[in-house]
């Protein structure tokens, strides 16, 4: 049995994919007999026992204008908790304050893995398009990560690209450290069986339901959802766009939808997992407009629910869908509206089955087993370290 610790910032009540991935992988590690601890930021210091392991919250301030996300600055407290837990392996889902714990782990002969949850080059381009020497700065930051950790885990080829480019441009060989390990999906909880006819009528009357689950921040490009709704209105496609999520752009988006009288409903962040499962299964199409998604867990949950997906052709979701269960398109609202209209002329039952079948190729158990194999963690392979 191994003791595996996973540390992360930006993990909280509204974290979405990161929180789901960490909790789900931890649960599979636990099912396989390992001890797991998650260390994350919180409103106060708190230790909670969960079915998937121990969650240690370290008191941390809220990042201004982030919509409630927190970041841990007291890394000594994190180190204290790690010493008490005595991990055999340390997983890191952070490029900022917590990355320095990789140095501590190295002094303790603890192997480490860094998870590339985002394309930092794309995030910087979205928020700081005119920043000088962007590529050099990003390469420097990524090189520091590569030097600090034993493994770099990307969920898709798209997520791995900036590290592959770093290896190529600097004549480095990161292949021994870099691995592709897709995420999974809860195929029991997310199912076409959750489709709810009463819910369909309640949220869209007799209109087709377009569903989007996203964070309302610049890098997710939520404004494009309203462009699509406007284009559907112009071409006469009778739809109701239901948007689940929250973030710093909420007021701006709501104001625009009201001003333009768009067929859009904002339902906020969905914390009820059962309600989310019903929404995903009741929707006719799932719209994933984020241009720089490195996996797209919500899109995979939609497929598991039997709901086809339209995504941006620049994101990693193109690696998740195929032509039988989804479409990838550029940022052109008229083309999205046309595809939406044409989609409803197709065999919806067959497409739903293809969507579910594609999702069944992904599982959390397989994700966890692949990671453990990569990390060379087997049953009974570790002794007490401290």
Question: What role is predicted for each listed range?
Answer:
Residues 251-270:
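Nucleotide-activated donor-binding/catalytic signature segment of Leloir-type glycosyltransferases, i.e.
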Residues 139, 147-177, 185-189:
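A short, active-site helix/loop in glycosyltransferases that binds the activated sugar's phosphate group
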Residues 202-230:
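Conserved donor-binding/catalytic core segment of Leloir-type glycosyltransferases
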Residues 308-311:
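Short hydrophobic beta-strand element within catalytic cores of glycosyltransferases
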Residues 291:
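Aromatic "clamp/platform" in nucleotide-sugar-dependent glycosyltransferases that forms part
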Residues 111, 122-144, 168, 191:
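Nucleotide-sugar donor phosphate/pyrophosphate-binding loop at the beta->alpha transition
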Residues 323-334, 341-347:
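Conserved acidic donor-binding segment of nucleotide-sugar-dependent glycosyltransferases
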Residues 269, 277-283:
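Short alpha-helical donor nucleotide-sugar binding micro-motif in glycosyltransferases
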């Amino acid at each position: 049995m191994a003791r595996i610790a996973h540390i992360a910032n930006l993990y909280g009540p509204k974290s979405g994919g990161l929180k789901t991935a960490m909790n789900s992988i931890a649960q599979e590690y636990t099912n396989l007999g390992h001890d797991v601890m998650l260390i994350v930021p919180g409103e106060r210091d708190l230790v909670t026992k969960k079915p998937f392991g121990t969650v240690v919250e370290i008191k941390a301030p809220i990042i201004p204008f982030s919509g409630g996300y927190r970041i841990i600055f007291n890394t000594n407290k994190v180190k204290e908790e790690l010493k008490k837990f005595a991990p055999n392996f340390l997983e890191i889902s952070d490029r900022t304050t917590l990355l320095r714990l990789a140095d501590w782990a190295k002094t303790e002969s603890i192997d480490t893995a860094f998870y590339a949850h985002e394309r930092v080059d794309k995030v910087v381009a979205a928020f700081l398009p005119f920043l000088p020497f962007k590529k050099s700065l990003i390469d420097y930051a990524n090189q520091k990560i590569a030097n600090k950790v034993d493994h770099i885990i990307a969920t898709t080829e798209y997520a791995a690209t900036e590290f592959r480019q770093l290896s190529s441009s600097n004549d480095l060989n990161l292949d021994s450290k870099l691995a592709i390990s897709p995420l999974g999906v809860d195929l029991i909880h997310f199912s076409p069986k959750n489709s709810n006819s009463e819910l369909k009528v309640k949220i869209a009357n007799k209109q087709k339901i377009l569903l989007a689950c996203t964070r309302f921040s610049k890098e997710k490009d939520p404004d494009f959802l309203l462009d699509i709704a406007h284009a559907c209105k112009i071409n006469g496609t009778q739809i109701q766009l239901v948007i689940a999520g929250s973030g710093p752009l909420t007021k701006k988006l709501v104001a625009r939808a009201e001003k333009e009288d768009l067929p859009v409903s904002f339902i906020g962040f969905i914390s009820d997992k059962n309600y989310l499962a019903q929404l995903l299964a009741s929707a006719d199409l799932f719209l994933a407009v984020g241009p720089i998604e490195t996996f797209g867990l919500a899109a995979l949950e939609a497929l598991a629910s039997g709901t086809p997906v339209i995504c941006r052709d620049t994101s990693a979701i193109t690696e998740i869908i195929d032509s039988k269960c989804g479409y990838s398109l550029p940022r052109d609202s008229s083309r999205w509206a046309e595809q939406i209209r044409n989609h409803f002329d197709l065999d919806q039952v067959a497409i739903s089955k293809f969507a579910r079948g594609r999702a069944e190729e992904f599982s959390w158990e397989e994700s966890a087993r692949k990671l453990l194999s990569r990390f060379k963690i087997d049953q009974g392979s570790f002794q007490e370290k401290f």
